Amino acid sequence: MIRIPKHMLAAGLALLIAGHAAIAAPTIAEAPVVTDPAITPPVAPPVDANPVASAVRFKLKSLPTDGSAQELKERAVLSDFYAARRDAPIWLTEGGLTDRGAALGAEILKAGDWGLDVKEFNLPAIPPPAKLDAEILGKADVEISIALLKYARHARGGRITEPSILLNSNLDRKPQLLDPETVFNEAAASADPAAYLRGLHPKHPQFERLRQAYLANRGKPLARRILANMEEWRWMPEDLGQMHILANVPEFMAYLYKDGTAIHSERIVVGETGKQTTIFTRPLKTIVFKPMWRVPESIKVHELQPDLRRNASMFRQHDLELETKDGKPLDYRTIDWNVADIRDYEVVQPPGKKNVMGVVK
C-alpha cells in the first residue's frame, strides 16, 4: 500500500480539475434528422410586409433602359422620388384613385383638346377596389407617373424625338423641354394637378388662338395644318422678352411687340417653297436701314447666269450691279457670259424701292 501525502493529494486534485476544464471530453456526432415530406408541412415563404411598395419597385426596375436622354432622365427622377417615400404610391390607395389621381388622369384623357394624342400616354385601366390587388395598384401608380412626365414632355415639343432627322432643316429651333424633376415635384405637391398640367402648355396668346381654331376645325383637313403651327409654338421660348419682333411668314408680315402688344408692322419678303425662309429664334443684335442685298451664290448660278446668257433682263428689272470680288464696279454688258463664270463676281442690289430686303433688315 502506497501512502500519498495530503498536500500532494490536494495538488493532484487541483491539477485534475484544471485539466478537466482545459480539455473537453470527446463528443459523439449526432445523426442527421431525416424528415418525411409526406408528413412534414412545407415552410411558408416570408410574408412581404409591403406588397404595394414591392410592386412599385418591380415596375420601376422593369422599365426600359434605352431611349432618349430625356426619357432616361425621367425614369431616374421617378426612381429617386419613389425611393424617397419608400416606394409608397402617389395617386392610388387600396380604395382606388385618390381625388388628385382622378383629376390628373381625367386631364390627361383630355390631351386631344390640346392637340396631343391621348393614346401616347398609355394610362392604365383602374379596376374596382375589390379587384385592385397590390400588384395592380403599384404597377398602375408608376404608369400614371410615367404618363404625367410624358405629357409634360409632349406639351413642350418633345414628341418629335429626332428633330434633326424628322424635320425640315429650315426649322432651326429646339424643343423647350421642362426639367422632369421640377415638373414631377410640383405636380405631386399640387392641390390641383389638372390645372398644373394645363399650365405646362405654351402661354403665348397665339398658341391659345390656334388651339381654339383647332377645336373648331377638329376632324377637318385644316386641323392638321393648325396642329403643325401649334407644334411650332411648343418650340418657341417661353419668354420672348419685353420687346420682340415676330415674323409671320405665311402672312408676309413682321410685327414689333412691346409688353405683349403689337406696336408696329411691316410687309416682309419670304422665301418660296424651294427656298424656304429659315424659322429661328435669336436675340436681335443689329438693325440695318436701307440695306444692300448681296445675291447668294445659288441664285447667281441657277437664275442670273442663264438670264445673262439670254438678255440680262433680270439685271435691268431689279437694278442689279456687278462687282469684282474686292468690290470694284463692273459693267455686266462688257462680259461674255457664255465663257465667264458668274461665281467669279459679286452681284449686289443697292438700297432703293426695288431692293428685296426692303427698307430695314
Residue ranges of model-derived segments:
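Cationic-aromatic interfacial patches
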Residues: 28-173
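Boundary at the C-terminal end of the N-terminal hydrophobic targeting segment
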Residues: 21-29
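Well-ordered beta-sheet/strand-loop patches within structured domains
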Residues: 31-72, 142, 146-150, 154, ...
